[in-house]
Amino acid sequence: MRTAVRSSAVRSAKKQQQHRIRTVARAEYGASGTSFYTTTEKQDSYPSLENILDKHCADATLKACIKELLDGCADITEALRSALVTVEGTDNSFGDKQLSVDVIADNIMWDLVKSSPTIAYGASEEEPVMVKCSGSDYTVCWDPLDGSSIVDNNWAVGTIVGVWPKNTGTGDDGMLGATGRDQVCSMVALYGPRTTVIVTLDDGVYEFSYGCTPEGCQLPDGSFEPWICSRMNIKINEDSKIFAPANMRAAQDTPGYKAL
């Protein structure tokens, strides 16, 4: 009898301790108890895309180009929500098997680039040949869907974009010798539980979030639009843990991965 009472008391004490741990976890971590909330404080509303570009992108033509590229990221977001991932039976120029979502994302980017009044040349990782477009100002190169091989497992994937002034380098397309330092803008879109796009502007790096609610994202004036600025002046800490699930093979022989 005494043993049973002691066992019951131990179980009760353990439950109380677990409850305290869960309470602390909820106070310090995200709702799942497994990940920190972002350091961004909750606000009733956030700056609009237009507001940030007006303040932090002095070139009106570049501003228009950025907005067009973000429209492309929004279209890819919607396509990924409904597209079935299938093998197309074709390879890209690097010998990678193309998936349906690769082709869909690349077609969205090409449609945008070829119709843009600001883009003079375009090239895709799927077929890295510079194509003359109808615009007049920039050369845009992109990977339409980085990590597409894991999208069917519901991992996050992304679009990577670089923007250069046309004729930055030499050669017929003006890109021979051009480097990343010559870019006037770069963008990384992440399509996960939500879509965010990291964009470099005149004075730093900004994060824009897409479609925060079915109505859109709320602005300071109470209205809604597709994009809001969710973080400003983003920096990568010198000591960070960054892991790429699509690069698991590197964990076998890369010391940095093992150290995680």
Predicted regions and their residues:
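N-terminal mitochondrial targeting presequence
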Residues: 1-32
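IMPase-like, lithium-sensitive Mg2+-dependent phosphomonoesterase catalytic core
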Residues: 26-87, 92, 97, 103-260
